[in-house]
């Protein structure tokens, strides 16, 4: 069976492409003939028209839109096309005409058109169903997979506890983490570009930190291995991949007691109210002072990531493709 994966135009943000680069080889092993096809055109009126014609000429037995270019679904066969929706954050971040365009061409019309939709979490599915109750029967939840290999590492004890923050956008809620740790003997490693306000807070409160931007996958993995705690009290996630990356790296995890992060983390994290700095602080102190508890939490994380292997996720997509062909 041929499966063509339709990707957005390549850009600096490669999170979707990275995810499917782990899943697709496992789908190949299940006997599928796969191709990855990237959109060569820009997102403007002429570019969209060219994109539609381009992808219509690349149709296979199964066409899988991997995300972002949701509008393409409107112009493809509804029975042989599946769309993966990662989140609906555009509905909360956009306003006016942009929000109207996003709703109709990224949400309503693609979902109305297709028979098959996947989401990466129950939360994203729930958000869609709240907007479009009639779409529930179309949606299958297939989670993201872990995108680097777990490996046993010899952790070298640090004189100062190393706390990792991954992502600096508003939804990552890193200011609450800053407030929670400002009086603790810790050092932060922050992955992502900091704005002026964030930098000022760190410097005004004499918080020890390192800032890493534009790093490679190998560098990111090394940062995880050198960290003691991932602090991830996010306010909104489509999934929450850093949780799994930390668990695979034997890093203790603190994350939000909201969906989908609490489901993704399983039993391998301390769940906190993301807006309660004192709760976050107490959780960090617990991990700093109770080595046995920390070890138990890390072991639970290593068990949890077994549910998110590329092989497991590929099998779920295979089951969906077979259903589409009936």
Regions found by a protein language model. Name each.
Residues 156-172, 178-181:
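Conserved donor-binding/catalytic core segment of Leloir-type glycosyltransferases
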Residues 235:
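Aromatic "clamp/platform" in nucleotide-sugar-dependent glycosyltransferases that forms part
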Residues 123, 145:
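Carbohydrate-associated surface elements
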Residues 270-277, 285-292:
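Conserved acidic donor-binding segment of nucleotide-sugar-dependent glycosyltransferases
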Residues 243, 251-255:
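Short hydrophobic beta-strand element within catalytic cores of glycosyltransferases
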Residues 192, 198-221:
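Nucleotide-activated donor-binding/catalytic signature segment of Leloir-type glycosyltransferases, i.e.
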Residues 222-227:
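Short alpha-helical donor nucleotide-sugar binding micro-motif in glycosyltransferases
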Residues 97-117:
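Membrane-proximal helix-turn-helix segments that form the acceptor-binding/catalytic region
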């Amino acid at each position: 069976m041929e499966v063509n994966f339709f990707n957005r135009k390549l850009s600096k943000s490669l999170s979707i492409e990275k995810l499917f680069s782990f899943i697709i080889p496992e789908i190949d092993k299940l006997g599928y003939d796969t191709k990855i096809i990237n959109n060569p055109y820009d997102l403007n009126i002429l570019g969209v028209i060219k994109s539609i014609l381009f992808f219509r000429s690349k149709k296979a037995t199964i066409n899988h839109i991997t995300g972002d270019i949701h509008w393409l679904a409107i112009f493809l066969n509804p029975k042989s096309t599946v769309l993966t929706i990662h989140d609906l954050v555009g509905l909360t971040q956009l306003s006016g005409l942009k929000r109207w365009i996003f709703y109709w061409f990224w949400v309503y019309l693609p979902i109305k058109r297709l028979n098959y939709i996947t989401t990466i979490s129950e939360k994203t599915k729930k958000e869609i169903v709240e907007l479009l109750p009639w779409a529930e029967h179309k949606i299958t939840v297939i989670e993201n997979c872990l995108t680097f290999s777990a490996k046993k590492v010899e952790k070298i004890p640090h004189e100062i506890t190393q706390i990792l923050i991954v992502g600096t956008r508003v939804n990552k809620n890193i200011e609450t983490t800053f407030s929670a740790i400002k009086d603790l003997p810790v050092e932060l490693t922050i992955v992502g570009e900091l704005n002026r306000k964030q930098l000022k807070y760190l410097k005004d409160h004499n918080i020890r930190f390192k800032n890493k931007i534009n790093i490679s996958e190998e560098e990111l993995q090394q940062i995880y291995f050198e960290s003691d705690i991932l602090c991830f009290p996010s306010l909104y996630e489509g999934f929450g991949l850093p949780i799994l990356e930390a668990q695979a790296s034997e890093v203790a995890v603190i994350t939000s007691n909201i969906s989908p992060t609490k489901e993704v983390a399983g039993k391998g994290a301390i769940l906190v109210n993301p807006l309660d700095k004192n709760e976050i602080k107490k959780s960090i102190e617990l991990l700093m002072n109770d080595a046995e508890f920390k070890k138990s939490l890390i072991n639970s994380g290593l068990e949890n990531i077994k549910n998110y292997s590329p092989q497991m996720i590929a099998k779920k997509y295979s089951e969906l493709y077979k259903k589409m062909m009936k």
